[in-house]
UniProtKB/Swiss-Prot annotation:
Annotated gene: rplD
Alphabetically ordered keywords of this record: Ribonucleoprotein, Ribosomal protein, RNA-binding, rRNA-binding
Protein name: Large ribosomal subunit protein uL4
Lineage of producing organism: Bacteria, Pseudomonadati, Pseudomonadota, Betaproteobacteria, Burkholderiales
Annotated source species: Bordetella pertussis (strain Tohama I / ATCC BAA-589 / NCTC 13251)
GO cellular component, one term: ribonucleoprotein complex
Gene Ontology biological-process entries: translation
SUPFAM superfamilies: Ribosomal protein L4
């Protein structure tokens, strides 16, 4: 698969990328599965309701069992009552995780990268470094490359690059092992350094 190789001025040459990573068919069902699993595994239990044993209430019977004409009632903590406990409350310990086999996950990442390459959303650079940790420098460099919303995958995250890009809302910098399916899909472009492509091939090939 031929990808664009950009220089510092944004001029493009051709880079021959490995078909094992960028030449696969798009498997929509698999990509959907790994994205959903990734989002589910990132979830933390932060909802909670009380059941009928946990709500504050009296155990006194609201009215006598027979003779009032009203429906019988045992206590005000019943889920039928306003202010009563939930019948099936959510718990912070709820487990949302989904298991995805490593082989499937790697195949899904390859499928995403291949589709992005076909859509001309992947570009390659030799390296991505900055002289100092200035956001202005990072923004200017990305502008010269013709990039605004971009995921930068580099073999080694330079401290200057990390500090300079962390305040840019549509830019993320990661190493190949941290390139997750959601980020790959989310950003308009993916910029990969040559050494990072070698690492991706070793990880996913």
């Amino acid at each position: 698969m031929d990808l664009k190789l950009l220089n510092d001025q944004g001029q493009a040459a051709t880079f021959s990328a490995p078909d094992t990573i960028f030449g696969r068919d798009f498997n929509e069902a698999l990509v959907h599965q790994i994205v959903v699993a990734f989002q589910a595994n990132a979830r933390s239990g932060n909802r909670a309701q009380k059941d009928r044993a946990e709500v504050k209430h009296s155990t006194k019977k609201p009215w006598r069992q027979k003779g009032t004409g009203r429906a019988r009632a045992g206590m005000t903590s019943s889920p039928l009552w306003r202010g009563g406990g939930r019948a099936f409350p959510n718990s912070p310990e709820e487990n949302f995780s989904q298991k995805v086999n490593k082989k499937m996950y790697r195949a899904g990442i390859r499928s995403i990268l291949s589709q992005l390459a076909r859509e001309d959303r992947v570009a390659v650079v030799d390296t991505f470094t900055l002289e100092s940790p200035k956001t202005k420098l990072a923004a200017a460099k990305l502008k010269s490359l013709g990039l605004d919303s971009v995921l930068i995958i580099t073999d080694n995250v330079d401290e200057n690059v990390y500090l300079a890009t962390r305040n840019l809302p549509y830019v993320a910098v990661v190493e190949p092992r941290y390139a997750d399916p959601l980020s790959l899909i989310h950003y308009k472009k993916v910029l990969i350094t040559k050494p990072a492509i070698a690492q991706l091939e070793e990880m996913l090939g």
